């Protein structure tokens, strides 16, 4: 399934870095740091990185999810400060990425470096019906760890 997403280039330097799928099977689109100069994240530090881009999904049946790049997280401890970013369909502002250095070494974020992935996902908006009791299920109220040993 393909949808068309409106995008604004807020910083002309990003015109050469429009998000694109790397392969036919790619789910995520890389987002890049729109920085004038390198920013060094010390261990434990967070920094809100601009991307120089804005999107408008318009259709409430979709949202965008911002996720960490696996290599940055595994090799350098760089993840998203909010763990997952959610871009609602009606948001039209600049995409920004909260980076968090959970590693033990300083990490330099360079201008135009790939810093996160964006995945467009379907959304179901639920309506809630208040009830006094649920119809029974095999799980019942079993929570954390109730279905296995780990």
From Swiss-Prot:
Pfam families the record matches: dUTPase
CDD domains named among the record's database cross-references: trimeric_dUTPase
Repressor is among the record's keywords: no
The enzyme's E.C. designation: 3.6.1.23
Reaction catalysis annotation: dUTP + H2O = dUMP + diphosphate + H(+)
Entries under InterPro entries matching the protein: dUTPase, dUTPase-like, dUTPase-like_sf, dUTPase_trimeric
Enzyme class: hydrolase
Alphabetized UniProt keyword annotations: Hydrolase, Magnesium, Metal-binding, Nucleotide metabolism
One GO MF term: magnesium ion binding
PANTHER family per record: DEOXYURIDINE 5'-TRIPHOSPHATE NUCLEOTIDOHYDROLASE
NCBIfam families in alphabetical order: dut, PRK00601.1
Designated name of the protein: Deoxyuridine 5'-triphosphate nucleotidohydrolase
UniProt source species: Neisseria gonorrhoeae (strain ATCC 700825 / FA 1090)
Lineage: Bacteria, Pseudomonadati, Pseudomonadota, Betaproteobacteria, Neisseriales
